[in-house]
From Swiss-Prot:
<keyword id="KW-0121">Carboxypeptidase</keyword>
<feature type="active site">
    <location>
        <position position="413"/>
    </location>
</feature>
<feature type="disulfide bond">
    <location>
        <begin position="284"/>
        <end position="291"/>
    </location>
</feature>
<dbReference type="InterPro" id="IPR029058">
    <property type="entry name" value="AB_hydrolase_fold"/>
</dbReference>
<dbReference type="InterPro" id="IPR001563">
    <property type="entry name" value="Peptidase_S10"/>
</dbReference>
<keyword id="KW-0378">Hydrolase</keyword>
<keyword id="KW-0732">Signal</keyword>
<feature type="signal peptide">
    <location>
        <begin position="1"/>
        <end position="23"/>
    </location>
</feature>
<keyword id="KW-0964">Secreted</keyword>
<protein>
    <recommendedName>
        <fullName>Serine carboxypeptidase-like 14</fullName>
        <ecNumber>3.4.16.-</ecNumber>
    </recommendedName>
</protein>
<comment type="function">
    <text>Probable carboxypeptidase.</text>
</comment>
<feature type="active site">
    <location>
        <position position="360"/>
    </location>
</feature>
<comment type="similarity">
    <text>Belongs to the peptidase S10 family.</text>
</comment>
<keyword id="KW-1015">Disulfide bond</keyword>
<dbReference type="GO" id="GO:0005576">
    <property type="term" value="C:extracellular region"/>
</dbReference>
<keyword id="KW-0325">Glycoprotein</keyword>
<feature type="disulfide bond">
    <location>
        <begin position="246"/>
        <end position="260"/>
    </location>
</feature>
Amino acid sequence: MGSWIPKLLLLQLVLLLTKHADSSSIIKYLPGFEGPLPFELETGYIGVGDEDEDQMFYYFIKSESNPEEDPLLVWLSGGPGCSSFTGLVYENGPLGFKVEAYNGSIPTLVSTTYSWTKVANIIYLDQPVGAGFSYSRNPFADRPSDTGSAKLVNEFVRKWLAKHPDYFSNPFYVTGNSYSGKVIPAIVQEISNGNYICCKPQINLQGYVIGNPVAYYDHDKDSRIPFAHGVALISDELFESLKRSCGGSYSIVDPLNTECLKLIKDYHKCVSGIYQELILKPKCETTSPDCYTYRYLLSIYWANNEIVRRALKVVEGSKGKWERCDLSVRSNQDIKSSIPYHMNNSIKGYRSLVISGDHDMTIPFLGTQAWIRSLNYSITEKWRPWMILDQVAGYTKTYANKMTLATVKGGGHTLEYKPEENSILFKRWISGQPL
């Protein structure tokens, strides 16, 4: 008799989650922000997958300009396992945290000046399932995968548009950075195929934006050593020895190549004190308010507050501790390389913008340039600086496949390190202006 109790409790939990699933709410006030929100925010869930068992949580912010005609973006953070909330409050959204020592109260939110929502509608989507506030109603759900995520995001977007038919005709873009930059080209292909083969509503797909994206991770990592040499983190002698002994491959090394392995250890000793996401920032303890990464703790304090969860309409019991980047979301990384997807999307004529912070050592610009070259498209606009107020903000190059590469001078692994410059860059590109 007693063995039925856990099953009964599990059934009750599933019924509770089912009852509240696939819903949305307009949010006018957020804990930590003074007064009503100066923009339109909706949060909610869309069920995807078998019997809608995967409940994907999103934050939708209407364009503050002309929402009826402005582009519609879905924004995906990296990881895999990072909540899209990290994009909303740290990178390109209309809210950010006031950075101050945590005193036990709800962290303070303030308005930003650089939000992409000035010119675009944005759906910040927690994916894959398990990231952010997304959850599965199936306690035995399969491990998420890159290709599976592409299919589920396609399903999410179609279902979201069915519930928001006013946005059918808006130009649609898939956007994000870091690890999501590997999956985004597959999502674009999935949406494109759906438009051609089977599915309604038709999505007005125009292209994609990716920042410091993973493309072929081993090759991306290989570019760290020449990058480190180029910015004077390792010596000429060590670099030349590494090239000679390792043959340019530093991620996958023959275990019998002891000389290469020893030199790679020497390399790691040289860069162990470097903050790889932006080499100009100090590497320090996140618990110190003086450290840049302390701001990440504020989102954890905020999102784990019960008052905040009620305000966001998070389904009770659906999520334990919220993590900005939940490394326990172990994804099956079955897309080895995104390059074939870029090729297919180019053939179909979709625009793309590749942003690269030039001081990121996680996914260095050298690796990004290398995979773009491998596409073998002719150059339609040669390498040149792009400017803000007569100052060089970065460099750009455009290719015949409608792909634009733009570096951001002094930028890091994500948009947050140069938000104003990234905002100007995006606004010019999305409107079709020259950078």
